[in-house]
């Protein structure tokens, strides 16, 4: 039986998940409709569709595993349920982070303007960067799937053996780190590109101020808005993996639903918050969302009039 605090936090997690799924579904549908209309899909459009679809799967897996862990923890030890969930999770989570990294790099190379020779080389060879990241993703999958299979087999064999669990704490943490090396690489690349873009925008704003453009200059406002979006993304991105770390640590603790659900809240903040940030920060998505809201409002008004 859940306590009042645990019940409230679980409602918060569920709300985050619903908002995240709705936001990502809208992003995917809007870009698919744009492709159907123009018969052409940009790199950003392709990345947004892939990011939205993979993140919908990630959210469903997080919620499914979270509810099972809270209400039916013993089900996870039956058959191959844990194994199937883990494999799907690894595939979708790596793919989601890969798409997010590609999106950050694409925005970085498109917006930033450094005189560094490495940056100029990367900017002229965007396709090479994507191919390299694709190779990193495949390598990460090939390395982590066998390791996860070994970890799951060991946990099945010794499940319930308290002494074995105590002995395997350090081994488990090392294995978790090794299996997530690919994720760590993409996280570092995303945060570095995000930081460099923030630095570029900050320098550009200072340069515009020194030239006497003023705070109300449209370009300055756009740059400030972009900086806020980037900082929000970085915070949510970090919180997502902090939440995942909390869930992993719960493996070593007696059943603590409050801590576990807190980890779920932090984990679900990123897919929910980032989808909203993408919609508000993208002109086409923002216009499409406003049209959708206007359409829903009109439908609701007509429905109320017909009832009366």
Swiss-Prot record:
Superkingdom of the source species:
Eukaryota
- Report the membrane topology from the UniProt record: Multi-pass membrane protein
The record's subcellular location field reads: Membrane
InterPro entries assigned to the protein according to its UniProt record, in alphabetical order: TAS2R (IPR007960)
Q: Which Pfam families match?
A: TAS2R (PF05296)
Name the cystine pairs: none
Which loops or segments lie on the Extracellular side of the membrane, by the record?
1-7, 65-94, 149-180, 254-258
Q: Which residues are glycosylated?
A: 80, 153, 161, 175
Chief subcellular site? membrane
Transmembrane stretches, by residue range? Answer: 8-28, 44-64, 95-115, 128-148, 181-201, 233-253, 259-279
- Identify the keywords attached in UniProt to this record, alphabetized: G-protein coupled receptor, Glycoprotein, Membrane, Receptor, Sensory transduction, Taste, Transducer, Transmembrane, Transmembrane helix
Give the record's GO CC terms. Answer: membrane
Which Gene3D superfamilies does the protein's record reference? Rhodopsin 7-helix transmembrane proteins (1.20.1070.10)
Parts of the chain on the Cytoplasmic side: 29-43, 116-127, 202-232, 280-308
Q: Which GO terms describe its molecular function?
A: bitter taste receptor activity; G protein-coupled receptor activity; taste receptor activity
> Which family does the record assign?
Belongs to the G-protein coupled receptor T2R family.
The task this protein performs is described as: Putative taste receptor which may play a role in the perception of bitterness.
Q: Additional info?
A: Several bitter taste receptors with distinct ligand specificities are expressed in a single taste receptor cell.
Kindly provide the name given to this protein in its UniProt entry: Taste receptor type 2 member 107
Organism ancestry: Eukaryota, Metazoa, Chordata, Craniata, Vertebrata
The record's gene field reads Tas2r107
